[in-house]
Regions:
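A generic beta-sheet turn/junction motif
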Residues: 15, 24-26, 53, 82, ...
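Tandem CBS (Cystathionine beta-synthase) repeat/Bateman regulatory domains
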Residues: 7-10, 20, 27
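Short, conserved beta-turn/loop elements at beta-strand boundaries and strand-helix junctions
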Residues: 11-17, 78-84
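Short, acidic/hydrophobic/Gly-rich beta-strand patch recurrent on exposed beta strands
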Residues: 19-25, 32-33, 86-92, 99
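A short macromolecule-binding patch
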Residues: 28-34, 52, 95-101, 119
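Glycine/charge-rich catalytic "coupling/switch" loops of P-loop NTPases
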Residues: 2-5, 10, 37-74, 103-132
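Residue-level structural signal for beta-strand termini and adjacent loop
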Residues: 14, 35, 81, 101-102
Length: 132
């Protein structure tokens, strides 16, 4: 699991769902939370939270697209297996672990030092209260 600490800067809620914007060292990370602000104490502006996402929930791109949760980085390390590959991407000093199929790595022409864009779906970012 990857964990990035940040502070909630905005909450947009409707029908028991919230779109939460968290300011982090990477930039703004957006997450969808299945609770109303009154139900989850940490879903409030200025609250410190952890943004958590699995290594398998990260998509790497070689070209920039117009999307939220898109962060530029450089591949710091790459362990290529027959089927799966594990990568570490440095995004503004934050090390993000990524798992891709080795076929994806080959198709994208990825290697150590390659500049990439990391894309996270807001639906796959989990927010957790950060100890004050």
């Amino acid at each position: 699991m990857n964990t990035i600490k940040g502070t909630v800067v905005s909450v947009n809620s409707a029908n028991g769902l919230c779109e939460v914007e968290v300011k982090t060292p990477l930039g703004s990370i957006y997450a969808v939370v299945l609770e109303s602000p009154g139900e989850a104490e940490f879903v409030k502006e200025n609250k410190r939270v952890k943004c958590i996402f699995k290594e398998t929930e990260v998509l790497l791109l070689r070209e920039k697209v117009s999307q939220i949760n898109l962060f530029e980085g450089t591949i710091k390390s790459l362990e290529k297996g027959r089927v799966l590959s594990t990568l570490v991407v440095d995004c503004k000093g934050q090390e993000i672990r990524v798992m891709l199929t080795s076929r994806q790595v080959d198709n994208l022409g990825l290697s150590q030092g390659t500049e990439v864009y990391m894309l996270l779906s807001p639906m796959h970012v989990i927010l957790e209260a950060q100890d004050e």
